[in-house]
């Protein structure tokens, strides 16, 4: 049994702009087990991605057009947490933790 897993991490500097430049083509081509995105710069509901076979986890910044992260994974986690427990930092949407 093959236990190889592929992890991708990408600072997209704005996911909406990145979508215009082939993000979905690249996403589908690399077929990653875990695809982590930083600097999404989105608010909840601004974008809907149809990624069959992937669980999606988003952490949005409170400040519009600022920071934000997302993880797309083929593997369902046991638990998910957002932030690091420090309110002055957690409002930026920079951390998502998946437990397996």
Where are these regions (language model features)?
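N-terminal, active-site-proximal structural segment of metallo-dependent hydrolase catalytic domains
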Residues: 1-51, 61, 66, 82
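Structured beta-strand-rich core segments of catalytic domains in phosphoester-bond hydrolases
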Residues: 47-100
């Amino acid at each position: 049994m093959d236990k190889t897993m592929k992890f991708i991490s990408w600072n997209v500097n704005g996911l909406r702009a990145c979508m215009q430049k082939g993000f979905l083509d690249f996403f589908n081509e690399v077929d990653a087990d875990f695809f982590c995105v930083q600097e999404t710069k989105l608010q909840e509901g601004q974008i809907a991605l149809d990624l069959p076979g992937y669980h999606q986890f988003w952490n949005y910044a409170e400040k519009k057009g600022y920071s934000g992260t997302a993880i797309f994974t083929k593997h369902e986690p046991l638990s998910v947490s957002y932030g690091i427990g420090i309110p002055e930092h957690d409002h930026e949407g920079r951390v998502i933790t998946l437990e397996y």
